[in-house]
Regions:
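S-adenosyl-L-methionine
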Residues: 1-43
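Conserved proline-anchored active-site loop of SAM-dependent methyltransferases
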Residues: 34, 46-63, 69-76, 153, ...
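Short glycine-dipeptide loop
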Residues: 44, 258-262, 349-354
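Conserved phosphoryl-transfer catalytic core
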Residues: 77-140, 251-295
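SAM-dependent nucleic-acid methyltransferase catalytic core
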Residues: 131-235, 240-250
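Extended, charge-rich helix/loop segments that form flexible
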Residues: 152-156, 164, 266-323
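Surface-exposed cleft-lining segments at the edges of enzyme active sites
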Residues: 321-332
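A short glycine-rich, Lys/Arg-flanked "PGG" loop and its adjoining helix->strand segment in the class I
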Residues: 335-351
Length: 357
């Protein structure tokens, strides 16, 4: 497999590849990595498993290669993004008709739209006229009966939000250090994105949908996936880098009504993710004496012993620093969670199957 190049471990390649670039996320990996692994696998009986589907790089690449793939994703919002990226047989005429309907809906309801409906966070990121159009576009999607087209348009709307803000709505962070030069014009930007997406799937419409995605926490076995049915696991797991994947999507989850506040993010998003940030838990709930008696610690005694040594060292170092981050606790939770992910992943893969991570 000749796929190694300087950007293979980043998402830069994906920014220039149709479908992959529909939803951009900086913490990713190149689609070329997946395609190189699956080269020559088209029409084979092999199945790829992706425990951290994210923005769908593995699933989209597998489908482009004609290889069956199954993925788990813990965030409801990202689940819809991935589904939309896998629907390539979209009727262009019906989609254009839906665009025209949305335009009419906005014009009909614009005057009577109440700014009280707007989430406080979003009111700081967009001007009022843009917010009205964004929210009315969102509301109009409830009247689109075709599920695939509705998700297709929802994805386009999520990307419109990046284009029309007062500030760069970057993932993973919101930057307020500079203002966007060309903010606003929400419907025109939305329409342009939809038309580009339709153009992108033109050459792909005869490709069978071979990838499927489940809303599921990969720390636990997915009952929809049988034992030993997958041949490959191709993924980029969450890193121990204190990046809060629940927090980074808050603009979208607040906008689409999935979350309202910090507690919602914890209860509805963070609880379904591998512990990768100190915001995922309360320090007061952690007891190292209880932790050392759990299944992870008992079944991995040598690993636990090494972690415990680091736990003490990090705790001592923290006393000399100004920050209050409990990285020692974060480390323990992370390794415990990843142990359960690896266990469930191993169970659905053939014994001795390739695991490219």
């Amino acid at each position: 497999m000749d796929f190694l190049h300087s950007e293979i471990g980043s998402a830069k390649d994906n920014f220039y590849s149709p479908v992959h670039n529909w939803y951009k996320f900086t913490a990713g990996f190149s689609y070329k990595f997946v395609e190189a692994i699956l080269e020559g696998e088209k029409n084979s009986q092999n199945i790829v498993f992706e425990p951290f589907a994210g923005c769908g790089t593995t699933l989209v690449s597998s489908q482009k290669c004609g290889v069956k793939a199954i993925g788990n994703e813990g965030q409801e919002f990202m689940l819809d993004i991935i589904k939309a990226k896998l629907y390539w047989n979209i009727d262009k005429t019906e989609c254009i008709n839906s665009l025209n309907y949305i335009d009419s809906y906005i014009k009909e309801h614009l005057t009577n739209f109440s700014m009280e409906e707007v989430h406080p966070l979003l009111s700081t990121l967009y001007d009022n006229e843009t917010l009205k159009v964004l929210y009315l576009t969102r509301d109009s999607l409830d009247h689109i009966s075709n599920d695939k087209i509705r998700l297709f348009l929802k994805l386009a709307l999520s990307q419109t939000m990046h284009k029309v803000g007062l500030y760069p709505i970057a993932v993973p962070y919101i930057s307020r250090t500079k203002r966007m030069a060309n903010s606003g014009h929400a419907f025109a930007r939305f329409q342009s994105i939809v038309l580009q997406m339709l153009e992108d799937i033109g050459p792909l419409q005869n490709i069978e949908q071979t990838s499927e995605i489940y809303l599921h926490d990969s720390r636990f076995e997915n009952p929809n996936i049988g034992d030993s049915i997958c041949n490959y696991c191709i993924t980029s797991p969450p890193y121990l880098n204190n990046l809060d994947y629940g927090e980074v999507s808050k603009v979208h989850t607040h906008f689409f009504g999935l979350t309202e506040n910090w507690n919602d993010i914890t209860q509805k998003v963070r609880k379904n993710l591998v512990t990768g940030a100190t915001t995922h838990y309360r320090d007061i709930d952690f007891d190292i004496n209880i932790f050392k008696e759990n299944d992870f610690s008992k079944e991995n005694q040598l690993v636990f012993d090494e972690l415990f040594t680091s736990y003490i060292q990090i705790m001592e170092i923290a006393k000399t620093r100004n920050g209050k981050k409990s990285f020692n606790i974060l480390m323990m939770h992370y390794f415990e969670d990843m142990y359960y992910v690896l266990s469930s992943t191993y169970k659905c893969n053939f014994l001795g199957a390739d695991n490219k991570q």
